[in-house]
Design a protein with these regions (language model features):
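Loop-helix junctions at membrane interfaces
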Residues: 1-188
Length: 188
C-alpha cells in the first residue's frame, strides 16, 4: 500500500509539473509586451516563481525549464532555449529553497518571503542571461540585454507577489499542497 501511495504522489507531482510547464509556456508566449531593446515582458516568470513555491526543487526546475525553453522555441528564439532551460530551472530552485527555509505561518511574513524569493530568482535570471550574453556577445552585448531583463524582473516580482497574495488568501497553496503531498505523508 505504501508504494501505491508513493506512486500516486509522484504521479500527481508529475501532473502538476506538466501543468505548470504548460502554464509557464502559455504565460510566456501569450501575455507579451515587446520592449524597444528587442526583448519582451511576460507573465512566464510569475508562474516559474509559483512553481518554485508549490513543487519540489526537481519538479519545479523541470517545469520552469521545459515551459520556458518551449516558449523560446515557439517564439522563434530556439537558439536561446538551452540557456533559458538552465536559467529558469535555477530560478525555480532558488524560489523553493528561500520559501521553504524561511517559511512561517503568518500571511504578511509569507508575502514578504515570497517577494524576497521572487527578487532572488530574478537576480538569478538577470545574472544568468548576462553571463550567457557576455560569453556570446561580449560585455557590450551583455550590457545591452540587461535593461530588458531588469524590466522583466521588476514586472515579475510585482506580479508574482500579487498572484501569490491572492493564492495565499484563497487557500490555493494549501489545496495544491494537500493534493500533491496527501499520500506522501501517510507513506513515510
Amino acid at each position: 500500500m505504501k508504494s501505491i501511495n508513493k506512486n500516486n504522489s509522484n504521479l500527481l507531482k508529475l501532473v502538476f509539473s506538466g501543468l505548470s510547464a504548460a502554464l509557464i509556456c502559455l504565460a510566456t508566449t501569450v501575455f507579451i509586451v515587446p520592449l524597444p531593446t528587442g526583448g519582451y515582458v511576460n507573465l512566464g516568470d510569475c508562474f516559474i516563481i509559483l512553481s518554485g513555491c508549490m513543487l519540489t526543487p526537481m519538479y519545479g526546475a523541470l517545469a520552469a525549464g521545459i515551459g520556458s525553453a518551449l516558449a523560446d522555441v515557439f517564439l522563434g528564439f530556439a537558439i536561446y532555449a538551452p540557456v533559458t532551460f538552465i536559467v529558469k530551472a535555477l530560478m525555480a530552485v532558488t524560489v523553493y529553497f528561500i520559501t521553504k527555509i524561511a517559511c512561517t505561518k503568518t500571511s504578511p511574513v509569507k508575502i514578504l518571503n515570497a517577494a524576497s524569493a521572487s527578487a532572488a530568482a530574478e537576480i538569478v535570471m538577470v545574472s544568468g542571461y548576462f553571463f550567457f550574453f557576455f560569453i556570446i556577445y561580449g560585455y557590450a552585448g551583455a550590457l545591452a540585454d540587461v535593461f530588458g531583463n531588469i524590466v522583466q524582473a521588476l514586472f515579475a516580482v510585482a506580479a508574482s507577489v500579487m498572484i501569490y497574495s491572492f493564492m495565499l488568501k484563497s487557500k490555493l497553496f494549501d489545496y495544491a499542497d494537500n493534493i500533491i503531498n496527501k499520500n506522501q505523508k501517510g507513506a513515510g
